[in-house]
């Protein structure tokens, strides 16, 4: 059985959300990332591609880059650019473009379900890319890149999501510079959280649609944490 869990998310304050939103870290090179953040000190690329705030020519895999990412992340948290929810929540995230949309849940999944193949993989991973994300996640003590998981049709979950999005206003609703609409709801009701968690009781597997390196890296950091705090 595939399981989901709520968590205390760290997320942008609503007034900063549009500025924080950024493309994935691995779809551009360093110079392109530098260009993208001009005039925007809040872009998440300052955290996910922190070499852009260090001297030109800095090795993007040097310890200084991960330390800079950590410092920027916690500085923005201290300044209120990001806030952390005080209780564990689930989140609904909708992406829209050209009249079409896809809606998903933002949740925690289990390391053990990755290890026992409840979470299915279909790609091999590269050691160098894993090492980069391991250092990033470990240094920041945060998972900064979501993994895109798919699952077979779940009518119960779909009904709960549809009902919630129809009844509750979103916390974010904006269009980013690339023309994609981002709409997010926070599910902070214990009733709906419990119903959604239970709705996955008959879901046998998750399938990694995107994020094999991020998932493998997060698992390895998680295993390291278990060793440190058995």
Regions found by a protein language model. Give the residues of each.
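A cross-family signal for N-terminal binding/gating loops and helix N-caps
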Residues: 1-230
């Amino acid at each position: 059985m595939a399981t989901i869990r709520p968590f205390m998310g760290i997320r942008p304050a609503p007034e900063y959300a549009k500025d924080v939103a950024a493309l994935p870290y691995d779809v551009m090179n360093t110079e392109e990332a530098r260009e993208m953040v001009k005039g925007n000190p809040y872009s998440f690329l300052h955290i996910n591609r922190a070499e852009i705030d260090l001297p030109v020519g800095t090795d993007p895999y040097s310890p200084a880059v991960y330390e800079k990412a950590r410092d920027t992340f916690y500085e923005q948290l201290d300044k209120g650019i990001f806030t952390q929810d005080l209780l564990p929540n689930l989140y609904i995230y909708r992406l829209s473009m050209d009249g079409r949309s896809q809606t998903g849940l933002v949740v925690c999944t289990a390391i053990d379900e990755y290890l026992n193949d409840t979470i299915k993989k279909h790609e091999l991973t590269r050691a160098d890319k894993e090492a980069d994300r391991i250092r990033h996640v470990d240094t920041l003590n945060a998972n900064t890149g979501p993994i895109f998981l798919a699952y077979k049709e779940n009518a119960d979950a779909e009904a709960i999501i549809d009902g919630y999005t129809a009844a509750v206003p979103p916390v974010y609703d904006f269009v980013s510079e690339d023309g994609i609409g981002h709409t997010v709801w926070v599910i902070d009701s214990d009733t709906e959280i419990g119903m959604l968690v239970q709705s996955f009781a008959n879901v046998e597997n998750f399938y990694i649609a995107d994020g094999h390196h991020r998932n493998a890296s997060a698992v390895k950091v998680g295993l390291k944490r278990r060793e440190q705090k058995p």
